[in-house]
């Protein structure tokens, strides 16, 4: 070993000597781990659940879970709208197709069969007032035979059923099959064993057994499907497209890396070590018992981007060192010595940023945080250790070394211009401008909306099939797919008292006069209709009676709008959409009413329904946002102080982060 090499060896840290004096062992261990984790990565499966997607500890969700058994049809549901392309629903062919779809859905695993509802359900009935009193029956009677007379009778029954705008479209061109789901259901092969609902499989069954099958069977029928399970299924199906997009990103990165480094060897080395990092992350994800959900499937992209960034820094450093080093090994060691600690601090900062996401009490977000933290930690081994070791063997081309030397001395006009902002004369002006922009960002940030800004599923493209189906239902039905459920809790047998019904009626009126609310339905709606009917259909009697016997009789037909002991009555609020401001207005109206009217024996509790879950999620994000930012700043500042032992240097690093946070809220 030359004198220079001996001197460099003496300056090396224990970690550097341990790694570079045992390079074959390092590569062998990495290869061994890669083979094992590759096998584990092949076992990763798409996985999600309803409860992982919601903030379980939020008061809204706690109340929903507390009354889960009484709200069986108001949680995780799918709505299938069967459209008659030509004509209306009152044809023999359409009704037969609707019956077949109803029966087909009934046998799909995961469906809560007791709550399945369509025009063919015996529980869907009509009622009218006649000279003899009340008359009623099933909307589709047992005598239905598809004849013109039977179809005319069906039309009359639908008009008298109160289902127009709910199960039947306002224009009579489509009707809905309402499908409540079970998160866990008995295994058909072993009834004592419970199976978790597989959203991807369920979505595929809806496509194959319902949409594809019946659209092909009856060209005059078009099927639209919306609901949480369908949305998640579509997101998981997007995984195939994500893999394809990842391949495209790989090719683009290959071209850009080669253009930058001018060395195919180092380009391939960076790509391989970064792909190893992605592979390890997926393998470790399976080892800790996680799968890929619609959110965590984006983590490999993130790990790939971070790995490429650190890899480019390493290659650039080795290229600069190569001009003065004896060989590739020495250049790799000098670069490792120079960049390992800064790289480690940067990776730790990334990991801390992801770990702070654990503050958000949503299962999929926490799994994303853990998965991303694992992936970032893996980069320490693949890009900070394995990459320099690999380059120490294969070296860097002379062309790449020359390019690096030229870049080090070349002054680019743009960067020269930008550097003027840091000159002593201009720096005060730069700081003043930055502070003004921060103030503007904080002021505009007050108007930042937490939640969705558009109709439909923001996770999917506006022209996706799901969002088009959702738009169809919003346009053709009075009851949208966005439902906020207020749970009215009373003492047993207390939900039918005049006090409780009058309070529900007042809340429904307030909500219906709130912007963004389509309608509100509760047992009061049925009670008023029945009381009117018992008084010869006179509209003057469409109100609540103070006679308790009359009230008790009037709610007998309000099936599904109160529980078995009449201690809970859901009030269903149908919204135009689930935009942030729509949810905020509806929730604020309910909370203001509850603050004034809650008593020991009468409470208005939020919230169930998909809109209630969205509102709870928005609140959790809003409450966690500032906490996460503060934690990130504290952790980054602490790491900077430990590393640089300089308060000024720490400020120079942290203050731009704060400025960026303020400005990002403007965007």
Annotate each PLM feature:
Residues 236-292, 359-363, 627-667:
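Interfacial segments of transmembrane alpha-helices in multi-pass membrane proteins
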Residues 420-421, 425-545:
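Juxtamembrane segments of multi-pass membrane proteins
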Residues 96, 144-264, 502, 548-636:
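Extracytoplasmic
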Residues 2-48, 389, 403-454, 468-471:
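Signature of alpha-helical transmembrane segments and their immediate interfacial
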Residues 81-84, 98-127, 505-529:
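Short amphipathic beta-strand/extended segments in non-transmembrane regions
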Residues 321-348:
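Helix-loop junctions and hydrophobic alpha-helical segments within the transmembrane domains
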Residues 2, 28, 287, 304-316, ...:
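Transmembrane alpha-helices and their membrane-interface boundaries in multi-pass membrane transporters
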Residues 47-116, 496-501:
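Juxtamembrane extramembrane loops of integral membrane proteins
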């Amino acid at each position: 070993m030359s004198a220079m090499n001996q001197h460099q060896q003496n300056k090396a840290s224990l970690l550097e000597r341990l790694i570079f004096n045992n390079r074959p062992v390092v590569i062998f261990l990495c290869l061994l781990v890669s083979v094992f984790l590759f096998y584990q990565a092949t076992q990763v499966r798409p996985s999600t659940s309803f409860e992982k997607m919601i903030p379980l500890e939020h008061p809204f969700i706690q109340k929903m879970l507390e009354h889960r058994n009484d709200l069986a049809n108001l949680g995780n549901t799918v709505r299938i709208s069967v459209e008659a392309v030509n004509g209306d629903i009152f044809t023999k062919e359409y009704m037969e197709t609707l019956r077949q779809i109803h029966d087909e859905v009934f046998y799909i695993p995961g469906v809560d069969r007791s709550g399945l509802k369509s025009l063919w359900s015996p529980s869907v009935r009509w009622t009218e007032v006649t000279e003899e009193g009340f008359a009623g029956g099933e909307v589709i009677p047992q005598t239905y035979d598809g004849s013109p007379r039977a179809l005319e009778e069906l039309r009359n029954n639908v008009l008298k059923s109160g289902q127009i705008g709910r199960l039947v479209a306002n224009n009579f061109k489509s009707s809905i099959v309402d499908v409540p789901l079970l998160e866990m259901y008995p295994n058909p092969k072993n009834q004592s064993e419970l199976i978790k609902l597989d959203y991807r499989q369920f979505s595929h069954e809806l496509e194959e057994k319902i949409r594809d099958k019946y659209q092909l069977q009856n060209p005059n029928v078009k099927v639209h499907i919306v609901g949480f399970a369908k949305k998640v299924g579509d997101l998981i199906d997007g995984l195939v497209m994500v893999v394809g997009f990842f391949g495209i990103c790989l090719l683009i990165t290959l071209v850009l890396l080669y253009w930058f480094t001018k060395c195919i060897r180092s380009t391939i080395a960076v790509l391989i070590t970064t792909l190893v990092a992605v592979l390890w992350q997926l393998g470790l994800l399976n080892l800790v018992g996680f799968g890929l959900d619609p959110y965590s499937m984006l983590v490999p992209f993130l790990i790939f981007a971070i790995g490429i960034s650190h890899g480019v820094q390493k290659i650039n450093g080795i290229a600069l060192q190569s001009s003065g080093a004896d060989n590739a090994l020495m250049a790799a060691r000098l670069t490792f010595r120079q960049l390992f600690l800064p790289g480690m601090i940067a990776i730790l900062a990334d990991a801390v940023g992801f770990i702070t996401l654990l503050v958000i009490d949503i299962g999929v977000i926490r799994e994303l945080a853990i998965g991303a933290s694992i992936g970032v930690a893996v980069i320490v081994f693949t890009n900070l250790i394995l990459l320099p070791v690999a380059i120490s063997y294969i070296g860097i081309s002379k062309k790449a070394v020359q390019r690096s030397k030229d870049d080090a001395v070349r002054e680019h006009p743009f960067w020269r211009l930008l550097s003027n902002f840091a000159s002593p004369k201009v720096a005060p002006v730069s700081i003043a401008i930055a502070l003004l922009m921060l103030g503007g960002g904080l002021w505009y940030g007050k108007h930042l909306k937490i939640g969705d800004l558009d109709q439909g599923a923001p996770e999917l493209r506006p022209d996706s099939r799901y969002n088009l189906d959702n738009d169809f239902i919003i346009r053709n039905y009075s009851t949208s797919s966005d439902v906020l459920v207020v749970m009215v809790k009373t003492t047993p047998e207390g939900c039918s008292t005049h006090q409780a019904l009058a309070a529900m009626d007042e809340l429904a009126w307030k909500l219906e006069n709130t912007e963004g609310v389509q309608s509100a339905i509760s047992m009061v709606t049925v009670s008023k209709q029945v009381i009117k009917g018992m008084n010869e259909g006179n509209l003057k009697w469409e109100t609540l009676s103070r006679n308790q016997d009359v009230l008790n009789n009037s709610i007998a037909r309000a099936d599904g709008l109160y529980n078995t002991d009449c201690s809970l009555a859901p009030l269903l609020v149908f919204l135009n959409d689930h935009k942030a401001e729509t949810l905020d207005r509806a929730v604020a109206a309910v909370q203001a009413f509850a603050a004034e009217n809650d008593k020991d024996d009468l409470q208005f509790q939020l919230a169930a329904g998909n809109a209630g879950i969205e509102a709870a999620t928005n609140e959790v994000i809003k409450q966690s946002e500032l906490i996460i930012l503060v934690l990130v700043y504290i952790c980054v500042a602490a790491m900077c102080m430990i590393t640089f032992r300089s308060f000024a240097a720490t400020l120079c690093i942290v203050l731009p982060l704060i400025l960026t946070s303020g400005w990002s809220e403007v965007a």
